[in-house]
Amino acid sequence: MSKRWINLVKDKTEQGDPAVEHLQLSQAFDAVRAELKVPGDFPPEVLEEAQAVVGAAALPKRDETTVPFLTIDPPGSKDLDQAMCIERAGKGYRVRYAIADVSAFVKPGGAIDAEARKRGQTLYAPDGRSPLHPDQLGEDAASLLPDQVRPAFVWDMQLDSDGDDTSVNVYRAMVRSTSRLDYADVQAAVERGTMDERLSLLKEVGERRIALEEARGGASLPIPEQVVSLDEDGNYLLALRPPVPAEDWNAQISLLTGMAAAEMMLHAEVGILRTMPEPDHNVILRFRRQARALGVTWPAEMLYGELLRSLDRTDPKHLALIHGATSLFRGAGYTPFDGGVPELTLHAAVAAPYAHVTAPLRRLVDRFGLIVCESICRDMPVPDWVRHALPTLPEIMTASEHLANAMERACTDAVEAAALQHRVGEVFRASVVDVTKNGGLVQISDPAILAPADGASSAGAEAMVELIEADVAKRSVRFRVVGGVTSQ
């Protein structure tokens, strides 16, 4: 599922260095990294191995450099895992999805492999990242950069006219991306009537896959970006940028691939699935109260996936609810198996079996899943070193996810405190969305923030709350109920 993104934008009046303009937040983010012991520089032996393998990679012989792949990523990204090419095929479609072949550079048991198993995944803060692999690989030799020949696992998928896959193959090949786009580029091109069929077909296939997701009861979470800026007085402002439809279309290609990978693994009875249970009843109740607090109507019979699809991304209150919906997607984990099929195979939000195989530059488990699937397609045994690693991956990935989530939460807390620090003493209208032994959680709508409140005792109640603390260094926001409590 999607992660929260925080974008620190430049001061409109100064156009200076964002790191200088946002010094208070940068210091808070540095403190988060130190407190959580976020990995820093790579050890010398890892950098030495990375330098050595760049010119000695185990490259595939198959050549698909004439296929017009393109990449779609956030602006400025250099760790490009995925490139796609979509074509018409009869009444359906042919989707080729190239995934960076990290295994061509990473020797099993080597220094890079050992360090990657310690890190688990790339960790993102608003002002920087702690990468899974050294930049010589992750942002250069293994990255699917434009006009560069790179090794990749190519997923060659035939889809029918409804967008359902009818055949899937995976093979290693050399590829070349011809275009590097961001989501805004794609959206603008499609809206003005692009002549690039790859983009018009991405919209077509993406919309068909969204319809299939809706039919099977799935739920996607297109997280809006938190945008942090400074006003003329130097106060922090917090807003949400709505995701554009192109982000959904692009995500559907990744979901298509992950679902195909899971089916492949289950048929071969070896692999590792990304699984997730249905959200707990109490989590749903709390989210319903959050929706009511933001003025969003949620009929009792409507599933949460339907609600998320129905929200208006141009409405700030709806965006705030989407941003808060991450609570519905917790509890995901990894289920390895080798011989037989596990009892739990479903990812509740996908509403189907699912596997992570599309982000090997940024997530450890994907490297192993890709090798499993390519071995299955070649009708070859999965390598022993991969089989031996599968049972170890859930613990590694769980630890790295806990760290990633803690970092995300701490950075978000710092940003929200910064946005409110000049408003301490103000009174806000709020709704109590949960009650704890230490008080409760209240939702205010402008800015859309969920925070603790002293004296909140009735879930679902409306109240007037005073902001009593907004401390960036402590990453703390706190309210207290001052009156006007009415039950719902």
Regions flagged by a language model, labelled:
Residues 2-38, 45-461, 470-477, 486-487:
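Electropositive polyanion-binding surfaces
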